[in-house]
């Protein structure tokens, strides 16, 4: 074979969602295996025999209103345990739905593009009729109950036949509070959780600023993405000196780990800067952009499936949050929280407090872009600059997060995270990062919220790539070798990584397609995961890495092999993705991901 990357042979695919739909009509006892194999070459993970175990359900009304269509199992004073049967049955992936039902129902599974890579579960918004999987698979479609699990997420899970269960029971997924670091060690390969250990490095306002400040010192003038911030009480004297030089200066004081407007104030009074409590004080942007004379900020949503290699997606939709009363530069108004703060949790009370004669407005992000178009504003430039701010924020914090993960997480693929990014525009349309939230609220109190957050919940779960879990008796020895990124690196991989990182440094950040001459099993897993992920992207947009983001590599605290591999892959794939995809498919057909041997091309 030729050693050139561009000469990879073309391989046709027989796997498709149509194949999956066709399997949906098989009976529980069907012996047909050809279509299952053709579907996507399912691994032992989902083709293994299934036990006849069932979760014992109890009738319990959900603690949140409007969720009575979602069953919660095991929430009684006496914990309900999973009963296991010694009898093993042979059954297919999906249930014996009738052909008529399948014709009207959306598919339950999303096939991989690649042989021997299992499919992922499809998620939908409320009201979508979805093909039911086999009963014994549906028994394992369980999600951990948590008080932070929002209604739109519950409804999305219910549409795909998931049951919400007590945390003491077997569960596949978790969406809730950030876990304690040590809890990540107990997670199993079949589980998915919505946080990374160490995410506080970007979610805490003090940590985020510390990391951005380091980047400002390394790259002067290139990381002015966040208003200057003081960490109190350490920086108290520096803050007082800043305020003394100009009587019009103010700062926004916030607790470092709060959300939804808790504990926020705009001030310049020394008494508001305690000498003991930990707070952050951020330069106040005195000339913000206003719409209809009101100050506003943006809530955007960023999704990160992995920090090695770092990948960042931004959701196409978002929220625009307004202050309740017209903005004024007057110092005398500085204490008016309804004028200077844009948190919806604060401003929704303005009408009841008598300071506004109507409910505070809220726009979608699309509404804002339409407004800019009508005003003749270059909104594409603003969007590019916002993307740059978000990318730089994640690059600033990725090293400490990776280091924290390495201590507490054996398999990175079990984690994913949705971040709430708060951005404000000044009067020159420059975007400024205010903070990053690691648990952005998906609770939806208005139809506008539902229109944004319900599709978001669905797209997040699809992008996360939730697999059908193995049977209860197979959990300890399930074969995850065909899953992307199994967390292990052999000597061959380590040697290749070290040599290419050294070459990258020697060539001053230049890399070429020779990095693809030999793809190791670990390389293949990472690229297969990425290509399948792009097939589930929904309304997210990949902003890093792309074919045009190689200039960001210099900002990383250290050169990571997987980052440069994926960056170069994006450059090589720009004109024709099918070439690389066909090569990966050939490797999958050769069971390369299960091999410890390197394949030469």
UniProtKB/Swiss-Prot annotation:
Protein name per its UniProtKB record: Tubulin polyglutamylase ttll-4
Cellular component terms per the entry's GO annotation: ciliary basal body
EC numbers for this chain: 6.3.2.-
MF-aspect GO terms: ATP binding; metal ion binding; protein-glutamic acid ligase activity; protein-glutamic acid ligase activity, initiating; tubulin binding; tubulin-glutamic acid ligase activity
The protein's role, per its UniProt record: Monoglutamylase which modifies tubulin, adding a single glutamate on the gamma-carboxyl group of specific glutamate residues of target proteins. Involved in the side-chain initiation step of the polyglutamylation reaction but not in the elongation step. Preferentially modifies beta-tail tubulin over the alpha-tubulin. Involved in side-chain glutamylation of tubulin in sensory cilia. Together with ttll-5 and ttll-11, required for male mating.
Residues the record lists as binding Mg(2+) 2: 435, 437
Positions bound to a protein: 260
Gene: ttll-4
Residue span of region Disordered: 1-37
